[in-house]
Amino acid sequence: MHPDLTERILQHLETTDKADTLDLAALFAEDHQKIVGSLKSIQAHGELVTAETVTHKSLGLTDEGRAVVENGSHEALVYDLVPPEGIAQAALMAAGGANAKVGFSKAMSHGWILVDKSVTPPLVRRKVDTITDVVRNQLQQVALGKGDQLPAKEVADFKKRKLLQETTTKSFVLARGPEFATTLTKLETDLTVEMLANGLWDQLKFKAYNFDALGAPPTRGHLHPLLKVRTEFRQIFLEMGFSEMPTNNYVESSFWNFDALYQPQQHPARDAHDTFFVNHPAKSHKFPQDYLERVKKVHSVGGYGSKGYGYDWKLEEAQKNLLRTHTTAVSARMLYKLANQEGGFKAAKYFSIDKVFRNETLDATHLAEFHQVEGVIADVGLTLGDLIGTLYEFFRKLGITQLEFKPAYNPYTEPSMEIFCYHPGLAKWIEVGNSGVFRPEMLLPMGLPENVNVIAWGLSLERPTMIKYGINNIRDLVGPKVDLKMVEEGPICRLDHA
């Protein structure tokens, strides 16, 4: 509130019937918003004044229009660039810059220049010796506040050329109200016990409640973008008839993480520079013994139609505990459970979304801890075609319809495919996941029937989240440098379901 300004407004109204806030701003040499703010303060004290909203429309220069006032119109600038001997049109366009095309067209229509085709190459020549820059002169009148004097045709043309813009200004016409006074009486904000006891409240004026005020935003928790995207992925899996797998085993044995997946014990992914091994407890001891023996055999000497890897499989390696490197370890446990359930095998569709851990170098796109999204389908006679069809359906629900597949190698799937999608924003194909058909060497030792195949695919949760929220550096999504304002103000996640 501006105490002196409010009283000046009231004193002025005492001498006149009506006053526009725009006129008051000019009269008092104050910003119009300050006048409006003082008006609201006056209105808070009761019906001292009445205010009628009025709308004013006026013409103003755009940035391009101001440049024309300062430097000249596009057509005049093009005319000035044409020397007496003429100039090639391409050279003229290059010299004229971004507005040369418009300037050339207007200069031609005004009859200021012509294209001389009697020479090779054709030259642009001046057609008149002098010109009058009418556009500049008319825009100068607008700059002086005389835009209402322009003919309607010119106004429409200048708007089309984005030299002028129409601005709408709201003001208030003030008049004396039924409680008019030239001074403001202090309004009470609280009704006290003393006021009620001595009856003083009846003589005082109280400030009215503002029921339109937004108030202070409540302090509350906010969902991280990863959780928002995770919810969308989970809903898509549930819509497709999948069941969620329990993923609470962050610490896993090498047996379930590697050996059960037919990944040899000499595989480089099992080295310490790729995997976080656990010291306490360092080993696991409880395994299904008959299943463990079948896994040992298929690794060492083969079986189920396979030659195996032909190496000395060691229990000590399988016992080592680690932070799981993929949620496929969870899938292995679920498939073993499915193979040995009462009543025999039944077709199943599973999914999981949870954390995995890799001993990787941290950079803008890689973390040592991230989320893996995995889908698994077990049924009789599944083929690579079923996998491709399922992937098209899954990614269609994500709003991705352009997919390509590239052959790849995984120890536990054959055939295997990398999944690529076309990113319109980046205008290129990007890798979004991996997929394949689980090998018989992995499935048959579990006890699954020979005619049962399992198809699976996986992708990270971080990459689609970064794409969805326009984040380029993963450190801006996870870690100590995350802007909490981004978490608080981030929109809900609605993937473009096709």
From Swiss-Prot:
Any single GO BP term? phenylalanyl-tRNA aminoacylation
Enumerate the residues binding Mg(2+): E414
Q: Tell me which Pfam families the record gives.
A: PheRS_DBD1, PheRS_DBD2, PheRS_DBD3, tRNA-synt_2d
Cofactor(s) it depends on: Mg(2+)
**Enzyme Commission no:** 6.1.1.20
Reaction(s) catalyzed by this protein?
tRNA(Phe) + L-phenylalanine + ATP = L-phenylalanyl-tRNA(Phe) + AMP + diphosphate + H(+)
Give GO cellular component annotations, separated by semicolons: cytoplasm; phenylalanine-tRNA ligase complex
**What InterPro entries does the entry give?**
aa-tRNA-synth_II, aa-tRNA-synth_II/BPL/LPL, Phe-tRNA-synth_IIc_asu, Phenylalanyl-tRNA_Synthase, PheRS_DBD1, PheRS_DBD2, PheRS_DBD3
Query: Where does the record place it?
Result: Cytoplasm
Predominant subcellular localization, coarse grouping: cytoplasm
Impact when changing A456G:
Decreased aminoacylation, increased misacylation of non-cognate Tyr, increased amino acid misincorporation, ommatidia defects, neurodegeneration, impaired locomotive performance, reduced lifespan, smaller organ size due to reduced cell proliferation and increased ER stress
User: Which residues are recorded as binding L-phenylalanine?
Assistant: T328, Q372, V373, E374, Y412, F438
Recorded GO terms, molecular function?
Answer: ATP binding; magnesium ion binding; phenylalanine-tRNA ligase activity; tRNA binding
Query: Which enzyme type, at the first EC level?
Result: ligase
Protein keywords: Aminoacyl-tRNA synthetase, ATP-binding, Cytoplasm, Ligase, Magnesium, Metal-binding, Nucleotide-binding, Protein biosynthesis
Q: What happens when the gene is disrupted?
A: Lethal when homozygous.
- Where along the sequence do coiled-coil regions lie? none
Subunit structure of this chain's protein = Tetramer of two alpha and two beta subunits.
Family per UniProt? Belongs to the class-II aminoacyl-tRNA synthetase family. Phe-tRNA synthetase alpha subunit type 2 subfamily.
For this entry, the protein name equals Phenylalanine--tRNA ligase alpha subunit
Q: Which species does this protein come from? A: Drosophila melanogaster
